[in-house]
A protein has these predicted regions:
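Structural preference for long, well-ordered alpha-helical segments within the folded cores
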Residues: 20-21, 80, 114
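Vicinal oxygen chelate
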Residues: 4-13, 43-46, 59-122
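Conserved short beta-strand elements that form part of the metal-binding/catalytic scaffold
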Residues: 31-63, 111, 117-122
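Core segments of cupin and vicinal oxygen chelate
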Residues: 2, 9-51
């Protein structure tokens, strides 16, 4: 039986730039990188138990992707990302609870270097 999502993969156009972006702005730690053949390069980053796999394959593009990170300091995190110049896609707003045990929560969406959308909730 399934237990959890093991990792999320994002295809990027510049692996080094994207590794630095996720380390600097979101606190991910780059822990492994390798070539998988045919020019495919893969970098793995961790944030707690969450694994982000960044892939780069020359000539391929990515479209229509987002993932969500939870933060315990929503306003402070949003302020820091805006101060650092990370592109704001959708301003902070309230959203409904998606599960009975939850209250509503705040969300915001920022843009990554290749157009991926990074949602924050808190």
């Amino acid at each position: 039986m399934f237990k959890r999502i093991d990792h999320v993969a994002v295809h990027v156009s510049d692996l080094d730039r994207s590794v630095k972006f996720y380390e600097r702005h979101f606190g991910f730690k780059h822990y492994f990188q390798h070539s998988a053949g045919n020019g495919l390069q893969i970098a793995y980053l961790k944030l707690g138990d969450t694994v982000l796999e960044l892939t780069h394959h020359p000539g391929e593009t990515m479209a229509g992707f987002h993932f969500c990170l939870e933060t315990d300091d929503f306003n402070g995190t949003v302020e820091k990302l805006q101060h650092d110049g990370v592109k704001l896609i959708r301003a902070p707003h309230d959203t409904a609870a998606r599960e009975p045990r939850e209250n509503g929560w705040r969300r915001v969406v920022f843009g990554g270097p290749d157009g991926e959308q990074i949602e924050l909730r808190g």
